[in-house]
């Protein structure tokens, strides 16, 4: 009997133990990352040929203590390598692990190689050659602290390389893991199996090979035992012949079918080629279509299983598409696959929540470095009374109602950017803005009293419903989370995409950026105020303070202003403002852009303006500003500085976003100024529900 070790992916050890025992292994002991077992020579070949789950089959050769590189050399030489190598066999050494003595794995591999070669030369035997690409023998050495474990890898290449997959195509999961996913899915061979996001077909091919009793090692052309002196070619050929016979019989007797689809035609062609090479191509129907086109291929039965490894993302801006995909899959399963089972393997358990399905079972496993989960679901049978599955119906109805009203209004006004929804329903606490053919969902961060999982699930529902109501593809939707800002406002960078979208607002063309910042470059609630500035600016010198991206300057310039002066502290936003001005044919000396602390610049400036627009922050204590600013506390002092720059008969439009702001009319009167509140005139229908989003005033000399 040989003592052996079968390695596997983390989380699959118990499954592998059961498989090895069915093959005849004895003394199976599960450890992290594999199973120790015992078996004769025939079992070695059986496990290599038939294990669908093992990554490698290892034959331990010995151990040694390593306190110096000489210890490693002598420990390796203690093994009788001349009785292990066939004459002329090539070899390669794979060394892993480090300690205080062996600090480089390449150095460790070199010492092992030297010890093996010297074992031959000392006996005056021909030295074996190293072949790193396709060796006849592969020696594995693991160094754990002071102990080196030396073994012969009888697999050669990893056992996940079945021989059917085109190596030029990357697979998101190895074949060994795919086989485990199929085994854990609850699918019964002989029943239909469907993968709606099949990629190169790995899950379906592994399932078909299992169902037709086709050994996973049948198509491999190279093994790690070809140079092993104890290799028994007779037994190996018997094992191989048995596998070939069983494969022919299994394929001839199998009657059920497999279905795979993917949106990428090139990937589907690769899947077809892989299935043909695996010998089960006739059993699988591959189609080019996305999940939105998914339908039950057997609506009249029998029931089967849907299995998949759907895509996942780590970036916030990739979530809308993925949430939409999962939500759509969940609804399609409920509407068309009643009585079927569903099994999904994912690195993102949160995304599986958007299916709106309750899992019956779940398993954990590693996919390389990723912690993954596999969840199995049973889809209830549909009846004549069953209603089609919907998502966030109250929210969807409100959004649909708002869209019907506002879309027509926006078209008549000549605007492409407007708010469609602003937390109209308390349980759906988001804002939805339309920017041309795109939409932005801003999630208001829920209070700590709200269960985070429920809030996230509700967000998934909102995304799916928004895409459905607006009829836009997922890549046209942007998701943002808006939290209470503490000292960091719209200048906070979120991304580096640099994607700008050109939109129209009345007669102006403006650039917006939906992904890189918390705000988009256009404050929608100030739309009417900007139009008013355009109407007031003909022949006037216009000053725009705290200008952001200069959209007010654009409207003033298009309204016939003699000059525009745009002041902001941010170089990024001033460059953006310049792009906006140029987009509208406004450039040259008449349109100045000044980077400065607005309050400091205001105190030192000595120019005169006919029309001034100022929309300061509610509060700021930026390090780049000389002092803190509070709009309630400091607005009179601000008006004092502005008055100095205001020509006789001039006007200041003053706006801010502080809720409950109280204008100090007496303080203004002492300065010789009067204030007229025009807030209601500046609120458009899309902000009718939120009348405190800003307040706006016209201030003139008394």
From Swiss-Prot:
Annotated catalysed reactions: guanosine(2445) in 23S rRNA + S-adenosyl-L-methionine = N(2)-methylguanosine(2445) in 23S rRNA + S-adenosyl-L-homocysteine + H(+); guanosine(2069) in 23S rRNA + S-adenosyl-L-methionine = N(2)-methylguanosine(2069) in 23S rRNA + S-adenosyl-L-homocysteine + H(+)
The UniProt record lists the THUMP domain at 43-154
Instruction: Provide the alphabetized UniProt keywords.
Output: Cytoplasm, Methyltransferase, RNA-binding, rRNA processing, S-adenosyl-L-methionine, Transferase
Q: Does the keyword S-adenosyl-L-methionine apply?
A: yes
Chief site of localization? cytoplasm
NADP as UniProt keyword: no
Where in the cell is the protein located? Cytoplasm
Top EC category: transferase
State the Pfam families in the record: Methyltrans_SAM, RlmL_1st, THUMP, UPF0020
Cite the SUPFAM superfamilies for this sequence.
S-adenosyl-L-methionine-dependent methyltransferases (SSF53335)
For this protein, what is the EC number? 2.1.1.173, 2.1.1.264
Query: Mind naming one GO cellular-component term on file for this protein?
Result: cytoplasm
Q: Name one molecular function that GO assigns to this entry.
A: 23S rRNA (guanine(2445)-N(2))-methyltransferase activity
- Entry's family note: Belongs to the methyltransferase superfamily. RlmKL family.
NCBIfam families (alphabetical): PRK11783.1 (NF008748)
Record PANTHER family: RIBOSOMAL RNA LARGE SUBUNIT METHYLTRANSFERASE K/L, RIBOSOMAL RNA LARGE SUBUNIT METHYLTRANSFERASE K_L
Q: What HAMAP family does UniProt report for this protein, alphabetically?
A: 23SrRNA_methyltr_KL
Write out the function statement from the record: Specifically methylates the guanine in position 2445 (m2G2445) and the guanine in position 2069 (m7G2069) of 23S rRNA.
Q: What is this protein called?
A: Ribosomal RNA large subunit methyltransferase K/L
Q: Which organism is it from?
A: Salmonella paratyphi B (strain ATCC BAA-1250 / SPB7)
Q: Which gene encodes it?
A: rlmL
